[in-house]
């Protein structure tokens, strides 16, 4: 029994060490798959020896039966809110008030942090062990969410290091990264579950589950930003020093925390964070600025329910209210009909927004939207503005029902919605001017046939003047005909003709992608090209044969098969080949003949790579005999996870698929 106890202790210590490296230092030493293996080993041992399970074991993150309701926890030190400023002038006025209140013109340095858009929580550690956690609530009393907080892998169940206080209450923010938010909503749409309006609502909903097992399935994370109770120990006398100490004890702290020596440096920090905001991978709504010296904080004190030594400098709001003037319906290249709300223009996150997507008929029904309604609009990063909810309490009397069209608003063809699909489609195909335009724009795009200089406005004119009906017609254009277009001189026209001639030499994968087959993206097109090698073999493939290709299931296989079964599509392909479109003959190499760790494996790339582009990595992997797929499935052998890997990584972990990082990929590529 002694050796089992030792084994359990070693496993728990190892897992805590790797949790610290992953969540706090952002420098994992092992792939997630290895972490999962260690966790499984610990779980199996504890199952065999339940008497040896300890409350701080990493396996105990998912415990506790569902609660009937949350009990209350009274905060020993109130959780105060912060005053807000919204512009430079207001911040500079705050800075002056701080300077004026301090004695002897003391120099002030500022500790600046991200203002995370999540849920504030307090977590109490006694002798380094997590004993309770609570929401902010009203600042005096919060809800007991201990069981749920224990499921969050970023939060240590036990602190490590030296001089840990007997009682330490840390404050911080639980939040949901963007990739996790998208996966939760994607799963909800597929299963008919609740769709969240934004990551903050999703984080709050996940943390306030009565069943901790549900919380455990949500990819919540946490950053620490302050302290409440402190007994039986000491902390540094600066705010930054305290955060760095928390990090040493295993608590995650944002790596964007910055010490600023002046108000000018604070403003520079604010603008840099605002610029970086779309690429952070999680929502923030401003920066928090705190006097760094604890002695100066004490001198400044508090007013009402907020400290005088800190302020939240908010970004322009990402959500605003406005009215829906009308709902129009756009037709995409595959015939998908998308409702778009035409709005009373409103500034959201610094941008004037007059349109917002409504996705599909189900979304309109879910929102209960009527024309004339007052709505909340959200715009986050580069995401297309969307309607979050209807303000039903302020619904005008003259609102009108949104009627989804039964005929295409462009060509008049029937609209159909296949059972099981959320999207309604125009059945007109290429007789529909809208589908024709969007199909041609896709065909000439950079990642398809890459026709330089042929922009959307040129395509619009070519279709409207009926110069072009199919992609093959593009290669019949002359400089003379193009010169007749608006803002197209002889030189520009000749440049487009030259670009079309150059585009005739392509690759089989690009050609397939350019055809615009439903559900066939770049990765799937590359997989089809690599597997079949020739157009003739692909055209003759059955649905069963198509499903042998990595990343191709029954739905994609059916779309590909139906595309090539359609005579008009085969005719367009024949015309394109007759116009001189061509690609190099395939070089067939059996995976068995390649001495490579990737040979014969189906590989998925996720996240961003720092040492090479995604395209270069794909090309190198294919050279070494790999089949690169675009999504994770049971057919996947290996996932390569770069920075900010999202739902694909989560799916790989769920399926138990091997995961390696970029460094390991580079090592194997060089071996």
UniProtKB/Swiss-Prot annotation:
UniProtKB keywords: DNA damage, DNA repair, DNA replication, Ligase, Magnesium, Manganese, Metal-binding, NAD, Zinc
Organism: Escherichia coli O139:H28 (strain E24377A / ETEC)
Pfam family, one: DNA_ligase_ZBD
Top-level lineage group: Bacteria
EC number: 6.5.1.2
Similarity remark: Belongs to the NAD-dependent DNA ligase family. LigA subfamily.
Cofactor (UniProt): Mg(2+); Mn(2+)
Ranges in coiled-coil conformation: none
Catalyzed chemical reaction(s): NAD(+) + (deoxyribonucleotide)n-3'-hydroxyl + 5'-phospho-(deoxyribonucleotide)m = (deoxyribonucleotide)n+m + AMP + beta-nicotinamide D-nucleotide
All copies of domain BRCT, residue ranges: 593-671
Biological role stated in the UniProt entry: DNA ligase that catalyzes the formation of phosphodiester linkages between 5'-phosphoryl and 3'-hydroxyl groups in double-stranded DNA using NAD as a coenzyme and as the energy source for the reaction. It is essential for DNA replication and repair of damaged DNA.
Residues reported to bind NAD(+): 32-36, 81-82, 113, 136, 173, 290, 314
Name the UniProt record assigns to this protein: DNA ligase
GO terms classed as biological process: DNA repair; DNA replication
Residues involved in Zn(2+) binding: 408, 411, 426, 432
InterPro entries assigned: BRCT_dom, BRCT_dom_sf, DisA/LigA_HHH, DNA_ligase, DNA_ligase_AS, DNA_ligase_CS, DNAligase_adenylation, DNAligase_N
Catalytic site positions: 115
